[in-house]
Amino acid sequence: APRHPKILSGLKMDTNDYSQWFRGSTPYISAHRGKTFVVYLGGEALAHANITNIIHDLALLHVLGVQLVLVHGGRPQLDKALPNSKTHIHRRITEPGDMDKITGIYGLLRSHLEGLFSTGLPNTPLHNVDISVVSGNFVTAKPLGVLDGIDHLLTGQLRSLDSARIRELLSAANLVLQSPLGFSNSGQAFNLASEELAADISIALQADKLIFFDEIEHLKTSQSQRQSTITPSTLDDFLADLSLGSAQRYLAMSRAVRAGVTKAHQISYVHDGGLLQELFTAEGVGTQLVEEQRHPVRAAVLADVGDIVEIIRPLEESGALVRRSR
């Protein structure tokens, strides 16, 4: 069923609420247009009841001009199909005899996502929205090898990414969908850690954002308050309180930001509308990870007036701020 009109916090909106929200979101709509976001959806998110709403929100980003690369996982689905498989530090040790099942499951998950983006029924937000979802052999992989004395067999890692081809597809208004599989130059398939692959792709593309969906909504301070922003150097303060999976995702986010990705965000896949609230409101709802501040904060001086006027101009034009003379 279609979602009821609601403000992003979950409250119903009247016409005035809609008007105010759109005015407030105008600067973000303008800022995100033409930017590249790499979005990670794990197998837990794919199995959750909210996945259809998440896809609709991603479709909205696409319509607003955001260039999207979507990387999916499949851990719980593989755990169910391969109950005897072993893991090491959150990585599956991929036996050669398991690859057919793994590629089959990833194929089903990819097809499921393609189907969700193709939903064009009249009572859905995707009615009359044409989204081309493209997958391909963009990832060249190599074996992960032996770690801590353990041979990871057909578990692999990124060797290279066809970034030029992905950018070409994004520029042509396609959404790129990547499964956690890669192939060697000889054609051997490798099973990749999906969180690490998402970070690797964001780094290779020098994406503007890397977005991870997780079960938890955000990090919390020692006083159980939401931590809206962290840096790679402050991440260690929170890792001990996270599950292994969540910790691995935050470490992947940190690695991406250190390598040049502008921002990384963690959002709950349980929270309906969480993606839109994080990206189009000042307060957000998740936790964002940014690089250490390169420039010190200082008080404004008279010479800054012109730049400040330009910064607030979109807010004045949208009606969010009252226009004033200098």
What are these regions (language model features)?
Residues 4-266, 298-312, 316, 325-326:
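Nucleotide/pyrophosphate-binding catalytic subdomain
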Residues 280-302:
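Conserved N-terminal entry element of GNAT/NAT acetyltransferase domains
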